[in-house]
């Protein structure tokens, strides 16, 4: 069996018994498993923590699994998502695949089939860039705030009391963490992450 000890799985299901059983099953792979009773709780965690695989049920109170899938892809387009659907619910499975799901798993869950699909997804999700999906530092967030305001690297350097080279480094790391290669996609990703209430440069003056 491959080593999955460095990978993180988010599992979402509103039934506590299912969460408990699935968590124990997934932990046998060695991966770190975080379970959520509501899709919105999972989405909140996705905005700040790295996740290598998201597994979600479809029919849940509040935000459904399909809605979570759609929002998760806005936050982390590279994230593989597996959707659990009821037996024979083909239309739902088709919707999930069209929304960006890597695969779907039918209920009732067959342990062998379930683990096989999960392992395939984890192998596929191994990030090429070690920074991809990591949380932004306070300085990177402040830099991003000024960048989104239209400030140049030189202006940002002056406001944050850093060298231009340091700002360029922060900018490069920020784009790598968010999985983007240009400013347009950076703006879109920042909006998807809800980065609207960012700290002002003044709050970071002591972090020099």
Model-derived regions: residue spans:
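Conserved acidic segment of CheY-like receiver
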Residues: 3-18, 22-26, 54
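Acidic, metal-coordinating helix/loop segments flanking the phosphotransfer/catalytic sites
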Residues: 35-53, 74
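Acidic catalytic/metal-coordinating carboxylates
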Residues: 37-38, 64-67
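C-terminal output helix
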Residues: 89-91, 105-118, 159
């Amino acid at each position: 069996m491959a080593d999955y000890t460095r990978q993180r799985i988010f599992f979402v299901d509103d039934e506590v018994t299912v969460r408990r059983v699935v968590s124990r099953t997934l932990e046998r792979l060695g991966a770190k498993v975080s379970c959520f009773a509501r899709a919105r709780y999972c989405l909140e965690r996705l905005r700040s923590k790295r996740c290598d695989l998201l597994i979600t049920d479809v029919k849940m109170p509040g935000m459904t699994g399909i809605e979570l899938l759609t929002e998760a892809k806005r936050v982390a387009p590279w994230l593989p998502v597996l959707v659990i659907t009821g037996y024979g619910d083909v239309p739902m499975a088709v919707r999930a695949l069209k929304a960006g799901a890597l695969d779907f798993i039918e209920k009732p869950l067959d342990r062998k089939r379930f683990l096989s699909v999960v392992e395939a997804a984890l192998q596929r999700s191994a990030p090429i860039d070690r920074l991809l999906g990591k949380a932004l530092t306070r300085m990177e967030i402040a830099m991003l705030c000024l960048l989104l305001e239209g400030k140049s690297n030189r202006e940002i350097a002056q406001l944050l009391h850093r060298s231009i080279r340091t700002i360029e480094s922060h900018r490069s790391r920020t784009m790598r963490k968010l999985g983007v290669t240009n400013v347009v996609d950076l703006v879109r990703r920042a909006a998807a992450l809800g980065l609207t209430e960012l700290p002002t440069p003044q709050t970071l003056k002591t972090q020099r």
